[in-house]
Structures are given as C-alpha cells and as structure tokens.
Amino acid sequence: MGTFSLNGNRSRISALCLALLIQSGGAFAGIYDDLLKAIEGDNTQEVTAILQRGMDVNTVDKSGNTLLMLAVQKGNAELVRFLLTHRARVNARNQYGDTPVLLAALKGHSEIIKLLVAAGGEINPSGWTPLIYAVFEGHEDVIEFLISKGADIDAVAPNQATALMIASKNGHLGTVKLLLKAEADTDIRNPDGATALKWASEGGHAQIVELLKEAGAEQ
C-alpha cells in the first residue's frame, strides 16, 4: 500500500522559469529573467534593485505564481521578509490553488511559515490546508507551529482524508503523536469507510496502530 505525496506536482521552478521566458517579450522579459536569476541566487540586494526599477512586487506568471511564492519555494527567508514589507500578497493563489503558506508548509520551511502567518497568511483555508500539506511530508516543527496557531486538526482534505489519516498511512510516527496530543479525532471515516487505524494497519505501521488503539481508535 503506497503513501500519499504531492512532490510529483510541486517541483515546477525550472519549468516555470522556462515558461516565463517563452511567454514574455522585450524589455519585460529581460527584467524578469534578471529577477528570476536573482531569486535563484538568493540575491536579495539584486531583487530589491530590480523592483525599484518598476517591477510590480505582485507580478505573476501564466500559472499565477508570484515572486513571494518563488522565494518561499527557494527557502529564502530574507527575501520573503523583504517582499512582505513591500506588500506582496500573502494569500494569493496560483492556478494549482497553492498559497505561499501552503508552499512553505509543504517544503517544511518553519521560519518562513512563521513570517507568512504573522503577515496574515491563512491557516485554515478551504480545500487543502497548510497542516495537511505539512503532514504529507512529516514536517513536525511546522505541524507543531500550525497546531499552536489554531489549525483545524480534523479538517477533511479534497481527497476525503484528515491529517491523522494521512500521517497514519504514510507511517509518520512523530506526526501521529503530535496529532493525537492535539486530540485529533481517531474515528473519522472517508466515503469508503476507511479510518486512520485501518490505513495504519494496512501499511504495516505497527507502532502507529498501537498508538491509535491506545487512543481508542476503531477500525
């Protein structure tokens, strides 16, 4: 039985750069090319200089990815901080529905997600949530932070699974412990009747099975 993962659809920076170069023309393409190179090179000073030449901080590509999203994916906290102070839209969504907070959660960038949430980034948006994104990859520091900020522990994702169900299926023992400590509901079922305990059992995750049973879970 496999695990849940989002990585296959999220490694898009190289393709994004190419798409930007193809779709843009003239001076704008040249400036954007310089801007992307500066972001890739963690050159906050150069990014600052380019934006001062008139580039909109909320410029997006054809997929709706903003400069803030690129900086988040790159893990550049300094650049994220700079963009936020220059009114980058913290809850913008790209065509995949991702926000900067969602991307930070998926990548496990704990410092960055704290900056984004402090700037008004949504913790409990509709659809996929930052908590569930972090749970996919077992980013425990991010998970712990989101729980402390009021993340909905039992939110049901578009795949009809909760964070506890996903963590149990993927075998993330530490994550399961955090979710149970936060009193996640052990008995939520998906439309097929599956529970966190059922998925943990099918995946052969004996320690998680034991934890769930101790918490009163039913299969």
Task: Please annotate each region the language model reported.
Residues 46, 78-79, 111-112, 141-142, ...:
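Conserved ankyrin/ankyrin-like repeat signature
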Residues 60, 93, 123-127, 156, ...:
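Ankyrin-repeat boundary/linker signal
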